[in-house]
């Protein structure tokens, strides 16, 4: 059964249409986790901690890819909804070309700033060499990494989410196989982990680039375009929430690492690394659903179909609530197994990780609502509200909690901070959904 953006969506259609995006994001997260598993088990906790220290800086550099993908896909979907296909294709081409140019500049700047940033983020003389070796190789694939994040969204707009899933599977399997070979067989350590990731990201970014360069049967193809500053500005505005989410999360991760180095040392950073890797997989379900459903919302917004917007919002929130309950139960029950994948070689570290993860996992009861609400407003081309939700969720609520709560609860306060932040983000999301209901007509 073919599903198009203009359809009326039942639960079955909604899940079928978003399923490739959900699986794609979960697999992407799992493939990223493989680096951590191999490094932790074959290289050691210090190398594992070093990757967690430098990763926020690398994610900040790549955040523009998430912004362009989410903001640009919303704009292109809305333009398709108005019936202007030529304009939609021109915007798509412009965004890809600009992203490649910006990616080159960021790669050069990242290589220059890598070592100073590692020191600033808390790397000592033991961890610094690991950070630099890992980061330099990852930066070589920064442009493909950005393109991968952009094309994940645009393949949905092109009504080819299955292709995006296949590319993600190919990229991820490459990462897993090369991780095993480079780290477990050749014993290349963090260099092997970085090389495996860089190669897999290149596959994930370059294959869809070639797909859109050559003639294809989708709605999109790269071609001639012209500079359109209003489209660039609208893309940045629409994608500001995703950009701020990635920037803010990276800054918050830096703060977590700093607090944990102060209160628990490198073992604390390793524990947080385990929690983050597992949390990425769980959050990927919400992100994948939001990413997969956003073009539908954008299309019906552009077409002025308010009844379908109401239908999409209500069904989505019911699905998100179901996901949240299931993930929380899985996290609480499976904490020993999930932690053991990374640190079973150290029982003290394992016990510490299980305790921390069970505290942290309560946040999954709230996490999905704010992620979807932010994406929903991005799809409506209301980038301001989307950015406010994302910025407050991480940069204000979580930062404030991780600074304040440890004064009263010690290390436990660090794990509880995410729960407080996610709950406040849900309240803020509900406020904006109620306030904007009349404007967009989804009540």
Segments and roles (model prediction):
Residues 30-48, 118-125, 181-188, 250-281, ...:
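Helix-terminus/linker motif at the lipid-water interface of multi-pass membrane proteins
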Residues 1-18, 76-141, 187-240, 297-362, ...:
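Short alpha-helical transmembrane segments in multi-pass integral membrane proteins
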Residues 22, 26, 30, 34, ...:
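Generic alpha-helical transmembrane segments of integral inner-membrane proteins
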Residues 69, 138-156, 167-175, 193-206, ...:
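Short runs within selected transmembrane alpha-helices of multi-pass transporters and secretion channels
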Residues 21, 25, 37, 41, ...:
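Transmembrane alpha-helix boundary and packing residues in multipass membrane permease domains
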Residues 16-35, 137, 148, 171, ...:
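Transmembrane helical elements of multi-pass membrane transporters/channels
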